[in-house]
A protein has these predicted regions:
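Core catalytic ATP-binding domain of two-component histidine kinases
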Residues: 1-149
Length: 149
């Protein structure tokens, strides 16, 4: 997956998140999935390419919605210190074996998946000098966490 060099500018993370939430609400409402926002009072300002990062967020939220299928919740949270964005879902979760393969080219758990969505996400986040993790936790939530430099 070839990703263009990011054209990064200072952005308020909460505004970027809110724009993506509005875009994904229709998809989620059709599946009876509630998007719950917990955005920090002070909006973190991060350097990012708005267009690329919105594609990352839409991909993550879409994956979360597909994992839930119907009747669940997606939680979106931002924090300032550390500057972090977390997207958690009540979907079916990720087992340990799958977790190790998630960012491998052409690996997918979806019947017709091509395995390029997470590769795209990984490449964009690396180009933004972000650290990230994707795993399921004992509380039943699967969390995609992104830490900004």
């Amino acid at each position: 997956v070839r990703i263009p060099e990011p054209q990064s500018r200072p952005q308020e993370l909460n505004q970027v998140v809110f724009a993506c939430k509005r875009f994904m609400e229709t998809v989620c409402q059709n599946r009876n999935i509630e998007i719950v926002m917990d955005l920090s009072e002070e909006s973190p300002v991060v350097n990012l390419d708005n267009s690329l990062f919105e594609q990352v967020l839409v991909n993550i939220i879409k994956n979360a919605a597909e994992s839930i299928d119907r009747d669940g919740k997606i939680y979106i949270r931002t924090t300032v210190r550390p500057t972090c964005l977390e997207i958690a879902d009540t979907g079916k979760g990720i087992d340990k074996d799958t977790e190790t393969k998630l960012f491998s080219p052409f690996f997918s758990t979806k019947p017709n998946g091509q395995g390029i969505g997470l590769i795209f996400i990984r490449e964009v986040l690396l180009k933004h000098d972000c650290r990230f993790s994707l795993r399921s936790y004992p509380d039943g939530l699967t969390r995609f966490k992104i830490w900004f430099a």
